[in-house]
């Protein structure tokens, strides 16, 4: 899993091991933070928990969750020039075909912005995919969240809060495929006619 995304999940998933007594004594330097008992939904600690902020690559937690609910691992996506993106990448090439599961590894291990865009084809393209992200956020009760893209690049109308992201993390780790991918250190993706074997590593 990418270092940035992993750090984000570790912060969010401290909810599983911090007791209320410890939470009371916490001091954090982050602008905003929430610790939550994932089983009970009880907030143990918060600092600016409802402040709307940029969420960068932690966006990809929602991207993965939406894909896992709307596509099969063996579904195949054809990469197009529209899937190329700035920033972190799994180095996709236009014209190659990639399985959804391999794109999920590229999304969560490499923090691939290109993988995020390619995965929007699971919903028929960027606009309907982002709509699904916002529908899922609403279903989870993420009342102070709005998604504008699947990779977390800064954009108008793209924000969340520490509280909402704690809710999202708790939902994501309930998915066994999400847990399996995020627990991997590396994976080698199958070669295609256009690209040789590709290794994704955290």
Pin down the residues of each PLM region.
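Bacterial N-terminal signal peptides that target proteins for export
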Residues: 1-9
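Bacterial N-terminal signal peptides
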Residues: 8-17
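A short, well-structured edge-of-sheet supersecondary motif
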Residues: 24-46
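Penicillin-recognizing serine hydrolase domain
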Residues: 26-30, 125-202
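Active-site SXXK
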Residues: 40-41, 54-77, 165
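Short, well-structured active-site flanking segments
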Residues: 69-82, 176-184
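Acidic helix-start/capping segments at beta-turn-to-alpha-helix junctions
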Residues: 78-89, 155, 188-191
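Conserved catalytic neighborhood of penicillin-recognizing serine enzymes
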Residues: 86-121, 198-202
């Amino acid at each position: 899993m990418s270092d940035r995304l992993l750090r984000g999940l570790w912060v969010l998933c401290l909810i599983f091991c911090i007791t209320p007594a410890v939470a009371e004594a916490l001091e954090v330097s982050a602008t905003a933070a929430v610790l939550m008992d994932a089983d009970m939904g009880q907030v143990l600690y918060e600092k600016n928990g409802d402040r709307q902020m940029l969420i960068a690559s932690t966006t990809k937690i929602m991207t993965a969750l939406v894909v896992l609910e709307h596509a099969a691992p063996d579904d195949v996506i054809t990469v197009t020039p529209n899937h190329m993106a700035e920033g972190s990448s799994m180095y996709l090439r236009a014209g190659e075909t990639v399985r959804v599961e391999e794109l999920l590894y590229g999304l969560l291990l490499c923090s691939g912005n290109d993988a995020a865009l390619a995965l929007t084809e699971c919903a028929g393209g960027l606009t309907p995919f982002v709509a699904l992200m916002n529908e899922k956020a609403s279903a989870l009760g993420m009342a102070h969240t709005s998604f504008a893209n699947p990779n977390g690049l800064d954009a108008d109308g793209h924000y969340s809060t520490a509280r909402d992201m704690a809710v999202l993390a708790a939902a994501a780790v309930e998915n066994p495929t999400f847990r399996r991918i995020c627990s991997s250190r590396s994976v080698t993706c199958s070669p295609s006619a256009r690209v040789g074997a590709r290794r994704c590593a955290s």
